[in-house]
UniProtKB/Swiss-Prot annotation:
Organism: Mus musculus (Mouse)
Entry membrane topology: Single-pass type I membrane protein
Residue spans, topological domain Lumenal: 35-182
Transmembrane segments: 183-203
A Pfam entry, by short name: zf-RING_2
Signal peptide bounds: 1-34
Enzyme Commission identifier(s): 2.3.2.27
GO molecular function: JUN kinase binding; ubiquitin protein ligase activity; ubiquitin-protein transferase activity; zinc ion binding
Residue ranges, compositional bias (Polar residues): 317-328, 365-381
Name of this protein: E3 ubiquitin-protein ligase RNF13
Glycosylated residues in this chain: 88
Domain of life the protein comes from: Eukaryota
Family annotation (InterPro entries): E3_ligase_sorting_rcpt, PA_dom_sf, PA_domain, Znf_RING, Znf_RING/FYVE/PHD, ZNRF4/RNF13/RNF167_PA
Comment block on domains: The RING-type zinc finger domain is required for E3 ligase activity and for promoting ER stress-induced JNK activation and apoptosis.
Length: 381
């Protein structure tokens, strides 16, 4: 599921482009403006601007050619006189109707019933173009012919020179252009879909990254299982590989399974916030049995060679004893000491317990020149 969302987001730009082109190509077939080309018997032509109605059929893309007839009565609020060649299928007639007195849909419906193929409604005492509409759904369902609206001066010119009686004819030509809202609405829809997909992708990516980081980091309970050693002069450790400062008496050192030691204040944030590997040898720290998935992922990552891969394997780095590493002979001893130094508040309790037991045995630690420690136990009765 997550993979499919990622693949969908990768192609969001392509999806947006394809949908935009298809929607615009479809909407461009819907004209919102048109022109009337008028021709008289001398083949003189004139163009008049009009505005198609919001109901009825659209003008065909090639235009509609026909003969212009004045409506009788002019307002067409009642049944009008049919065209002279109503029964001749070869002739197409367009009626010119005056505005006012009744609704636009009634005028156009009466023209359709009379046998006209289109209707032209003109304004009265104005050349303003009006978008004709209707709220009567039943009437709108009955209208099948296209209709346009023109100004009064255009209507007067058509009556004077381009009517059927004067040997003229007209062509209603659609103009394939769209207003801003026709472009804006599909654009906003597509942009909204893309934004939703982007938000889904970002949330999915955030959840995946957070889950991956949690698997690659050490939990608090796992960190507490790592031994802590209190540094004393003569110990094998010398310098913290993170802060590059020499250890001082009383410093708390975190001992990792690879025998590398660091300041607790230095290595703890690395293990809990960055990655649960040794900063020097990259060996995994405390692999948990219940975290098999993270172990598998980490092992696969460690097997891949990259610029962060250490030059020496973990076993070799342990033998070099660099940056405060601890030999195997002392790691077990430090594991036993860690319980004594895990918390400073428990030192007094531990020391008092040791005083009670000193009457039975005492431990004498002698440092040998070769760096190894011999333990001699003597009875002090």
């Amino acid at each position: 599921m997550l993979l499919s969302i990622g693949m969908l987001m990768l192609s969001a730009t392509q999806v947006y482009t394809i949908l935009t082109v298809q929607l615009f190509a479809f909407l461009n077939l819907l004209p919102v403006e048109a022109d009337i080309l008028a021709y008289n018997f001398e083949n003189a032509s004139q163009t008049f601007e009009d505005l198609p109605a919001r109901f009825g059929y659209r003008l065909p893309a090639e235009g509609l050619k026909g003969f212009l007839i004045n409506s009788k009565p002019e307002n067409a609020c009642e049944p009008i006189v049919p065209p002279p060649l109503k029964d001749n299928s070869s002739g197409t007639f367009i009626v010119l109707i005056r505005r006012l007195d009744c609704n636009f849909d009634i005028k156009v419906l009466n023209a359709q019933r009379a046998g006209y193929k289109a209707a032209i409604v003109h304004n009265v005492d104005s050349d303003d173009l009006i978008s004709m509409g209707s709220n009567d759904i039943d009437t709108l369902k009955k209208i099948d012919i296209p209709s346009v609206f023109i100004g009064e001066s255009s209507a007067n010119s058509l009556k004077d020179e381009f009517t059927y009686e004067k040997g003229g004819h007209i062509i209603l030509v659609p103009e394939l252009s769209l207003p801003l809202e026709y472009y804006l609405i599909p654009f906003l829809i597509i942009v909204g879909i893309c934004l939703i997909l982007i938000v889904i992708f970002m949330i999915t990516k955030f959840v995946q990254d957070r889950h991956r980081n949690r698997r690659n980091r050490l939990r608090k309970d796992q960190l507490k299982k790592l031994p802590v050693h209190k540094f004393k002069k003569g110990d094998e450790y010398d310098v913290c590989a993170i802060c590059l400062e020499e250890y001082e008496d009383g410093d708390k050192l975190r001992i990792l399974p690879c025998s590398h030691a660091y300041h607790c204040k230095c290595v703890d944030p690395w293990l809990t916030k960055t990655k649960k590997t040794c900063p020097v040898c990259k060996q995994k720290v405390v692999p948990s049995q219940g975290d098999s998935d993270s172990d598998t992922d980490s092992s696969q990552e460690e097997n891949q060679v990259s610029e962060h891969t250490p030059l020496l394997p973990p076993s070799a780095s342990a033998r070099t004893q660099s940056f405060g590493s601890l030999s195997e002979s002392h790691s077990h001893h430090n594991m036993t000491e860690s319980s004594d130094y895990e918390d400073d508040d428990n030192e007094e309790t531990d020391s008092s317990d040791a005083d009670n037991e000193i009457t039975d045995h005492s431990v004498v630690v002698q440092l040998q020149p070769n760096g190894e420690q011999d333990y001699n136990i003597a009875n002090t009765v």
